[in-house]
UniProtKB/Swiss-Prot annotation:
Pathway: Quinol/quinone metabolism; menaquinone biosynthesis; menaquinol from 1,4-dihydroxy-2-naphthoate: step 2/2; Cofactor biosynthesis; ubiquinone biosynthesis
Signal peptide as annotated in the record: none
Organism: Rickettsia akari (strain Hartford)
Name the record gives this protein: Ubiquinone/menaquinone biosynthesis C-methyltransferase UbiE
Binding, S-adenosyl-L-methionine: 68, 92
Source taxonomy: Bacteria, Pseudomonadati, Pseudomonadota, Alphaproteobacteria, Rickettsiales
Length: 248
């Protein structure tokens, strides 16, 4: 039996995606609020920096693990304000999260040129060479087979298309590491319990962050999927990093 990590637990490979889906379905209604509380609002600045890596909004963009739609909505609003002709496809394996994203696009009148697809990052239902950009924010560490997802990203991008990933990473400064670990393992699950009633979901969150590859390890994984000009930029001392690469 093929076992992989689900947080600090070992589970059968075939069961991980269902467990991850359950985590996000259980916290979907409080997801945005928890992001604000856990990061003290910093996640909004990280995402703003992330979308600045997409200079050409006259593009077809695939946002994978779109969740509640933060990245896609920022891109859609920016394109509308600039008068750009953007086409956005939001993809997530969790239907509850995608429903929340769709509701937000309607509430903000940003639903033009947006498509929604319930799909796995490991098996994207799109033809080869379809997109100018592939974006994924705080999602790839939840994918059971990250290498397979990276290869799928490479497949669906057009030649010269850009892969961009925002993900929790490894704090670089030694003086900050101990506090960050205490905050992650002691405070975040407690906040999760108070706000969502689901402490276990946020225990999984911090455990999955702890187990995610380092910046340099993930850079190598992206390169091995076929991407060129692969690099990353640390934000907030390495709490998160933006990774990118091109299909050449």
């Amino acid at each position: 039996m093929n076992h992989i990590d689900f947080g600090f637990k070992k589970v059968d490979y075939t069961k991980k995606q269902g467990l991850v889906n359950s985590v996000f379905s259980n916290v979907a209604d409080k997801y945005d609020l928890m992001n604000d509380l856990m990061s003290f609002g910093l996640h909004r600045l990280w995402k703003d920096e992330f979308i600045r890596r997409i200079p050409n909004l006259n593009s077809h963009i695939l946002d994978v693990a779109s969740g509640s739609g933060d990245i896609a909505l920022k891109l859609a609003k920016k394109a509308r304000d600039r008068g750009n002709n953007i086409a956005l496809t939001l993809s997530d394996i969790n239907e509850e999260m995608l429903k929340n994203a769709k509701k937000k696009t309607i509430d903000l009148n940003l639903f033009q040129n947006l498509k929604f697809t319930v799909a796995s990052a490991e098996e994207l239902p799109y033809p080869d060479n379809s997109f100018d950009y592939y974006t994924i924010a705080f999602g790839i560490r939840n994918v059971p087979d990250i290498n397979k997802a990276l290869k799928e990203a490479y497949r669906v991008l057009k030649p010269m298309g850009k892969f961009i990933c925002l993900e929790f990473s490894k704090v670089k400064e030694s003086y900050f590491k101990d506090f960050y670990k205490f905050y992650s393992f002691s405070i975040i699950p407690t906040i999760g319990q108070v706000i969502t009633g689901n402490k276990e979901a946020y225990e999984y969150l911090v455990e999955s962050i702890e187990l995610f590859p380092s910046q340099d390890e993930f850079r190598i994984m992206i390169k091995e999927a076929g991407f060129e000009e692969v690099g990353y930029k640390n934000l907030s001392g390495g709490i998160v990093a933006i990774h990118s690469g091109y299909k050449i």
